[in-house]
Amino acid sequence: MDTDYEAVVYDLDGTLVHLAVDWAVVATDVIEVYDEAGVDARGADLWGLMERADDHGIASEVEAAISEHEHAGAHDSRRLPLADELLDRSVPVGVCSLNCERACRIALDSHDLAAAIEAVVGRDSVDTHKPDPEPLLATVSQLGVEPSEAVFVGDSPRDGTTAERAGVDFRRV
C-alpha cells in the first residue's frame, strides 16, 4: 500500500487498538449529565447525546464524562494486529479518531506506537467530528499531502463515510 499512497491515516479504536471502554456505562454517565441539567435524554444514543449537548449548554460536561472513560480505557487498551503494519510504513502516518485526542495519545504511547505517528486528530481537536470530513482533512493536511494522495483505514461505516466526504480513499478492516 505504501507505493500507492503518499500517506496513511488510521482510525484508532477497533483498528489499531481496542479501548477498554464499556460504552453502555459511558451512555449512562452522559444521561446523568443530561438529567442534572433537567434535559430528557430518553431514546437517544451516545453519539446523538454528544451531538445535542451543545444545544443544551452541557457540551463540556458531556465531553468530560466521555473522555474520563476513554482515558482509562486507553491505558487498558489491547493492541490489535494492524498496529504492527503502521510501524513498517515508509510514508507519513496519522490517526483520525472519534475518540478524544488525549485518549488517542495515551493508547499510542501505551503500545509504543506514538513515534510512528506524525499527526493525531481526535473529536476534540477540530470543531466537528466524523463523519464530517473536517477531522480527516485536518489529519491529511498535517501530514502534508492532498486528500487524493492518502488512504484512510478504519473499521466502521462512519469511517467510510468520512473518507468519502473528504475525498480520501478508504480501506475497511
Language model feature labels by segment:
Residues V26-R78:
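A metal-dependent, Asp-based hydrolase signature
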Residues D2-T3, R89-V91, L143-E146:
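Glycine-rich phosphate-binding loop signature in dinucleotide/nucleotide-binding domains
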Residues V153, A166-V173:
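C-terminal binding/interaction regions
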Residues H71-V95, C100-R102:
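Short, acidic loop-to-helix structural element flanking the phosphoryl-transfer center
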Residues E85, S156-D159, F170:
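Short glycine/proline-centered loop/turn elements that form peptide/ligand docking sites
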Residues M1-A44:
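Active-site neighborhood of HAD-like aspartate-dependent phosphohydrolases
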Residues C100-V151, P157-T162:
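Substrate-recognition "cap/lid" segment bordering the active-site pocket of phosphatases
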Residues V93-G94, A150, F170:
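Hydrophobic anchor at the start of a short beta-strand
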